[in-house]
């Protein structure tokens, strides 16, 4: 007869399986409701709600301090929201994020990796964190895809900023995530390299059906890549839609002109809260 501890372990295992099976395959990958973040009485993110559809590329756009990075940090579980709900891949990120984090990844040129480790060592660390098989082959494969094979034995700290951006993208793709979150994915890349990186991300999305959410100041990049744009200002989402719809609604020539129109509109201002 099973002991009490064995029965408890079995029940825990069954509950984990049920939880994992409950992670849905609905058309909505990210659902955010009334998300708020306060810092010392200032609303950095002010009661925003939005959805991201499966297989789409969506952009968070806004000026410095608009709340983009804070929003991404809450989606990733790096910051706890002051209020609101975050549901990703069918899981409540406040209580069950362990079920979906293995299916996600993140890239930012502003989040450092150990500078004294080689590129290969850095990528190997992340491959092991995700519990991947054939780690050496996977590291080689993703390095080849990102055209950084010749840097594998080089310490990360000795690379140029553009090369580091490629390594960050390689790290983010190491586990072939269903959901890829990107903060300024082409920062520090020259125009030719940035164009190549955009093409690579677009190809990855088309090949795998992955969902991409990115924050960017590059309106040309957003206009080319994204199916949907969330325009942020002063911690709120002031407008959203496809690049084409936004351009038409504001009667502008391109998305950069829309961005400038919203940025110069004084209607929205960050609220102070006690």
Predicted regions and their residues:
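Conserved ABC ATPase "signature" region
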Residues: 124, 128-151
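Catalytic Walker B motif of ABC-type/P-loop ATPase nucleotide-binding domains
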Residues: 180-184
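Conserved ABC ATPase signature
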Residues: 155-159
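Helical segment within the ABC ATPase nucleotide-binding domain
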Residues: 195-207
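Conserved catalytic motifs of ABC-family nucleotide-binding domains
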Residues: 176
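ABC ATPase "signature
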Residues: 240-241
């Amino acid at each position: 007869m099973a002991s009490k501890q064995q029965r408890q372990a079995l029940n825990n295992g069954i509950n984990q399986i049920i939880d994992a099976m409950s992670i849905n395959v609905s058309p909505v990958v990210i659902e955010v409701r009334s998300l708020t973040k306060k810092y010392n009485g200032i609303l950095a993110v002010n009661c925003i709600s939005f959805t991201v559809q499966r297989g789409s590329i969506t952009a968070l756009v806004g000026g410095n301090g608009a709340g983009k990075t804070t929003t991404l940090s809450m989606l990733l579980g790096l910051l706890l929201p002051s209020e609101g709900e975050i549901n990703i891949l069918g899981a409540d990120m406040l209580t069950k994020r362990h079920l979906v984090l293995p299916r996600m990844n993140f890239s930012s040129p502003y989040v450092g990796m150990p500078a004294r480790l080689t590129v290969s060592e850095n990528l190997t660390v992340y491959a092991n964190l995700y519990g991947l098989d054939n780690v050496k082959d996977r590291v080689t494969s993703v390095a080849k895809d990102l055209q950084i094979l010749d840097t594998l034995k080089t310490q990360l700290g000795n690379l140029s900023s553009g090369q580091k951006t490629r390594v960050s993208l390689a790290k983010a793709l190491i586990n072939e995530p269903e959901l890829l979150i990107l903060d300024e994915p082409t920062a520090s890349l020259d125009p030719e390299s940035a164009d190549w990186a955009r093409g690579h991300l677009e190809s990855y999305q088309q090949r795998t059906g992955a969902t991409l959410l990115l924050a960017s100041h590059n309106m040309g990049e957003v206009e080319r890549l994204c199916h949907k744009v969330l325009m942020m200002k002063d911690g709120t989402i002031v407008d959203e839609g496809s690049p084409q719809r936004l351009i038409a609604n504001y009667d502008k020539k391109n998305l950069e002109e829309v961005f400038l129109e919203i940025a110069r509109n004084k209607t929205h201002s960050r609220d102070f809260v006690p």
